[in-house]
Design a protein with these regions (language model features):
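Short, surface-exposed "cap/lid" segments of acyl-processing enzymes
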Residues: 24-68
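Short alpha-helix in the alpha/beta-hydrolase fold that links the catalytic acid
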Residues: 47, 208, 222-231
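Primarily recognizes the serine-hydrolase "nucleophile elbow" in alpha/beta-hydrolase
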Residues: 100-164
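N-terminal cap/lid segment of alpha/beta-hydrolase-fold proteins
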Residues: 1-26
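Short beta-strand/loop motif that positions the catalytic acidic residue
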Residues: 205-207, 212-214, 218
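Alpha/beta-hydrolase active-site loop
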Residues: 83-109
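Catalytic active-site module of serine/aspartate enzymes centered on a nucleophile-bearing elbow/loop
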Residues: 246, 250, 254-280
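Catalytic histidine neighborhood in serine/cysteine hydrolases
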Residues: 233-251
Length: 280
């Protein structure tokens, strides 16, 4: 299994850093692209292991990447780009994902010839970009979300008022102890582009097979979000898999300490879904 790093630039000139995971045969034509969630990054916990397992089990290349506003710097591990984290928006993440798909289609990613058929796997907030992209971009042929959010604007009226008053809010990163800033751009994006960022409406427009995986004990995103996403998707091509007792990260931690029963189940379901539904 080869892991080939790459760096792209989005429309603002900001770097999108990622990796291509590919076996010695070069894999089939369909490519799986993984989107991390809020405060996540491509090398967090289960992502490298999941990428390697999906590449091995499905025979398809897998791409992992950091959204340009993830806050993770060139060392791939630490939140050293807090200015970008503060400016990040949902729309920017959708645009970043398009940059990755465009590069793969153009043959600009290492070890990959031109590809034009993609499967998306997204965790948590990454599901917003993935579901909307799957609804808008005909190159996407298959979708899986893990513990994804069903709503972009998740803040109360009180929180939004305080956010506007102060110009920013701060979120604790319990792993590092850092306070991570969110600027007004995120709130304004969620309001200005509310129609496009309606995740449930996007799910209802899907024309591709969609697997919703959600842990019943998710402490960050209610299992109700997963149920709503599955209910919104077309009934003939959408499937809901609840992982009994599964938490938000399916029991995985960072640094990665190995798989768990819940994570193993999610990977098995995901690999099967892509193998069955992502055409070459």
């Amino acid at each position: 299994m080869a892991r080939r790093p790459f760096q792209l630039a989005n429309g603002n000139g900001e770097p999108i850093r990622g990796d291509v995971w590919i076996d010695e045969t070069g894999g089939s034509d369909g490519v799986i692209v993984i989107c991390h969630g809020f405060k996540g990054f491509k090398d967090w916990g289960f992502f490298p292991s999941t990428a390697e397992q999906l590449a091995t089990r499905t025979g398809r290349p897998v791409v992992t990447f950091n959204f340009s506003g993830s806050g993770i710097g060139a060392d791939m591990e630490n939140f050293t780009e807090l200015d970008k984290f503060e400016r990040n928006t949902f729309t920017q993440e959708i645009d970043d994902l398009a940059v990755v798909l465009d590069a793969a289609q153009a043959g600009e990613l290492p070890a990959l010839t031109s590809r034009d058929r993609f499967g998306l796997l997204a965790h948590s907030r990454g599901g917003i970009a993935a579901v909307i992209t799957a609804a808008e971009d005909s190159r996407v042929g298959c979708l899986v979300t893990w513990n994804a959010v069903a709503y972009a604007n998740r803040w109360s009226a009180k929180q939004r008022k305080e956010w506007r008053r102060s110009g920013r809010i701060e979120i604790l990163n319990s792993r590092t102890g850092q306070m991570l800033p969110l600027g007004l751009a995120l709130l304004e994006d969620s309001e200005r582009n509310a129609q496009r960022l309606d995740v449930l409406k996007a799910a209802s427009r899907l024309s591709v097979p969609y697997l919703v995986i959600h842990g019943t004990d998710d402490e960050s995103v209610s299992v109700a979000d997963g149920v709503r996403l599955a209910e919104a998707g077309p009934s003939a091509s959408t499937r809901l898999e609840l992982i009994e007792g599964g938490g938000h990260t399916l029991g995985a931690v960072h640094p990665f300490q190995g798989t768990t029963e819940h994570l193993t189940r999610a990977v098995e379901l995901t690999a099967g879904w892509f193998s069955e539904n992502l055409a070459d």
